[in-house]
């Protein structure tokens, strides 16, 4: 079977935004105007195609990323709609890892919001080209120019309007294309009735100014265009579009469009921008991989190469079981074939291949380079693992996921629920790398940990609905961490003689702080002081021991451990002995390396009417918060602050109380920071 769509006509893109900016509504309109669906479902009615989970329909928010495919102007578009709530940031992370482009959706009244900044940073980390869609131009308080300014100031990027709205709020009735200098007026809420007219007189000067600014900006990215511009030559429309496309692909230029997804205004022009400016798989740099010799190689998108793909998501389907979503970077994968999981060095059979449309499946025979699909039949492959054919032994770059910041205890209501709960937790943890479950060694309770109260609430609800498990839950707890503040060289020695073969493991390890870099293990053994087969057990022993820190038993993070010396016994040494020796070394380091307790710090933005500004500032300060700035927005005050998560429980209720229900806030994880001594003493006392 040959390729039906040329690779240069593929677009793999996602839609990302702050919650309530209109991502899913934009996705629904893309499906409708591209002919993929024939009836529009609204998010607020619980009828959108892309929000298919029961919890999504009930709450009117996106919880899991949903994939679909549409066609537009001879191009095949793979679209992934991602959540906007910070608790589900894992869905954005793994989607951006495999996408070639993205649409960043903004609320025209709010401009850049906290989660906008978060997803923008995620996209920048993976160097994902983006176009920006200022949505909700029909909303009260909508301001396109202010939104563009917020992009430039808060995101610090070259954001240049290529469209301008005709009117705003209730008077929003058209869009001016800055590139072509054409105006499009909308008849009611049906974009197919858009009428091209001359630019209204009151906008002519504004458009000319924006056009000159646009040409100057794109000319700075294209030498020939710059020469023509300086010589006063007329600039062709295609030349401008090509320069914009080149700038977008290299993440040096971010075109800004506008519209109202809910009112069907600007969606077709947005689809045109996806085709015109976002890259195909052959336009982006080749994927990087590490071969068996630990050398970096490039994976070029080609059907003729050996198969290599990345599993970026695992989901449980009630009808077909485990679904593994993959992006194919090279080669062809056929239904019924075998793939190799490189990390686990294990072969698995591909039972079936399906293209997804939200929760609906369309079975296909094969998937080719540059495309995205779901695989049925893979039992052991998890998120971030590389799949290849037998001829390749390379691994694509893995994904990095945030550590959980909140936890709570769960227990089955009946004995019959016990086994079902274990199965449910295991499957949910397979799906979500930011969801952790473990047993408290002191109480024996099962603890679940995640990115926020809503995250855990949804997971508990899924246990009840999907797995029929009834559980009791405890109060939410902060997920503290421990680390070292100073450097020390320590020794760990495990020697046991009790008749017969003994145990012998001996290590010398240098421990030092490794701020914001996680755990790093360095092997500096030379001259065979410790045989190679015992190096990995030393690392494993440290990783296991780091699950319980020396201060209060919390997991340890941000530590660099350098194994530089040690010894072994020809007969008595074993992997277990070196694991224990490593754990003893860490225990000794806990006495010498100045261990400290870390607490999660949250970035919050509080919006309150002017008269409650003082009370709000005082309340934040009383919670150990640090005010980072304030901003006047229309008739309300916006307060930005960093506050320990420990102090934020119950904040929603308190804010409603002292603002008479007129205040609101958003919160997201910022970083871990050292906990004050007084708080540490309280926490340690409570743990005893």
Curated annotation (Swiss-Prot):
CDD domains recorded for this chain?
A: EF-G, EFG_III, EFG_mtEFG1_IV, EFG_mtEFG_C, EFG_mtEFG_II
- What GO biological process terms does the UniProt entry carry, in alphabetical order? ribosome disassembly
One GO CC term of this entry?
Answer: cytoplasm
The answer on whether this UniProt entry bears the keyword Lyase reads no
Q: Where is the tr-type G domain?
A: 8-282
Disulphide bridges: none
Domain of life assignment = Bacteria
Q: Read off the SUPFAM superfamilies from this record.
A: EF-G C-terminal domain-like, P-loop containing nucleoside triphosphate hydrolases, Ribosomal protein S5 domain 2-like, Translation proteins
The compartments listed are: Cytoplasm
Q: Print the keywords alphabetically.
A: Cytoplasm, Elongation factor, GTP-binding, Nucleotide-binding, Protein biosynthesis
What the record says about family reads: Belongs to the TRAFAC class translation factor GTPase superfamily. Classic translation factor GTPase family. EF-G/EF-2 subfamily.
Tell me what this protein is called. Answer: Elongation factor G
Species annotation:
Mycoplasma genitalium (strain ATCC 33530 / DSM 19775 / NCTC 10195 / G37)
């Amino acid at each position: 079977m040959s390729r039906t769509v040329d690779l240069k006509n593929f677009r793999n893109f996602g839609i990302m935004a702050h919650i309530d900016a209109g991502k899913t509504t934009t996705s629904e309109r893309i499906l409708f105007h591209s002919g993929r669906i024939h009836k529009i479902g609204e998010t607020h009615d619980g009828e959108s195609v892309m929000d298919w989970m029961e919890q999504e329909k009930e709450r009117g928010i996106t919880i899991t990323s949903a994939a679909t495919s549409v066609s537009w102007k001879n191009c095949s578009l793979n679209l992934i709609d991602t959540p906007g709530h910070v608790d589900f940031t894992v869905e954005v992370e793994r989607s951006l890892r495999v996408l070639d482009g993205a649409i960043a959706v903004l609320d025209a009244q709010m401009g850049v919001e906290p989660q906008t900044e978060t997803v923008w940073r995620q996209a920048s980390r993976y160097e994902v080209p983006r176009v920006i869609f200022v949505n909700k131009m029909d909303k009260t308080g909508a301001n396109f120019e202010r939104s563009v300014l917020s992009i430039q100031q808060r995101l610090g990027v070259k954001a240049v309007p290529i469209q301008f709205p005709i009117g705003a709020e209730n008077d929003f009735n058209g869009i001016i294309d800055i590139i072509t200098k054409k105006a499009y007026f909308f008849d009611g809420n049906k974009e197919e009735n858009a009428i091209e007219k001359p630019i209204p007189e009151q906008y002519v000067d504004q458009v000319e100014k924006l056009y000159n600014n646009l040409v100057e900006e794109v000319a700075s990215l294209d030498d020939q265009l710059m020469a023509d511009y300086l010589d006063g030559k007329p600039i062709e429309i295609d030349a401008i579009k090509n320069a914009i496309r080149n700038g977008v692909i290299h993440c040096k230029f971010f075109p800004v469009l506008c519209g109202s997804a809910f009112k069907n205004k600007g969606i077709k022009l947005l689809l045109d921008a996806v085709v015109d400016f976002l890259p195909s798989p052959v336009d982006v740099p080749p994927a990087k991989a590490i071969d068996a010799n630990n050398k970096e190689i490039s994976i070029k998108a080609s059907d003729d190469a050996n198969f290599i793909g990345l599993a970026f998501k695992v989901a449980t389907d009630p009808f077909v079981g485990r679904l593994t979503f993959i992006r194919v970077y090279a080669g062809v994968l056929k239904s019924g074939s075998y793939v190799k999981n490189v990390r686990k060095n294990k072969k698995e059979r591909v039972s079936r291949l399906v293209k997804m449309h939200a929760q609906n499946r369309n079975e296909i025979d094969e998937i080719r380079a540059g495309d995205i699909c779901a695989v049925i039949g893979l039992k052991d492959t998890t998120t971030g693992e590389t799949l290849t054919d037998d001829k390749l032994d390379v691994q694509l770059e893995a994904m990095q996921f945030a550590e959980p910041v909140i936890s709570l205890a769960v227990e089955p209501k009946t004995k019959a629920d016990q086994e079902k709960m274990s199965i449910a937790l295991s499957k949910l943890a397979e799906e979500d790398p930011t969801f952790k479950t473990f047993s408290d060694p002191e109480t024996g309770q099962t603890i679940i940990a995640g990115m926020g109260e809503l995250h855990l609430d949804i997971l508990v609800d899924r246990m009840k609905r999907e797995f029929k498990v009834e559980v009791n839950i405890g109060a939410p707890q902060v997920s503290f961490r421990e680390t070292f503040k100073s450097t020390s060289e320590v020794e760990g020695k495990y020697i046991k003689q009790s008749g017969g073969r003994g145990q012998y493991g001996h290590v010398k390890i240098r421990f030092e702080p490794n701020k914001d870099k996680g755990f790093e293990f360095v092997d500096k053994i030379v001259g065979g002081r410790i045989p190679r087969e015992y190096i990995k057990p030393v690392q494993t022993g440290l990783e296991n021991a780091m699950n319980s820190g020396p201060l209060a038993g919390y997991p340890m993070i941000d530590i660099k451990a350098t194994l530089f010396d040690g010894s072994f016994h020809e007969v008595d040494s074993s992997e277990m002995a070196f694991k224990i020796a490593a754990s003893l070394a860490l225990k000794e380091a806990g006495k010498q390396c100045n261990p400290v307790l870390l607490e999660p710090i949250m970035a919050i933005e509080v919006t309150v009417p002017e008269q409650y500004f003082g009370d709000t500032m005082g309340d934040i300060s009383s919670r150990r918060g640090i005010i980072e700035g304030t901003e006047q927005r229309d008739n309300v005050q916006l307060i930005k602050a960093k506050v320990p998560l420990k102090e934020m429980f119950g904040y929603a209720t308190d804010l409603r109380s002292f603002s008479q229900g007129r205040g609101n806030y958003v919160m997201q994880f910022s970083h871990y920071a050292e906990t004050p001594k007084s708080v540490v003493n309280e926490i340690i006392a409570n743990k005893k």
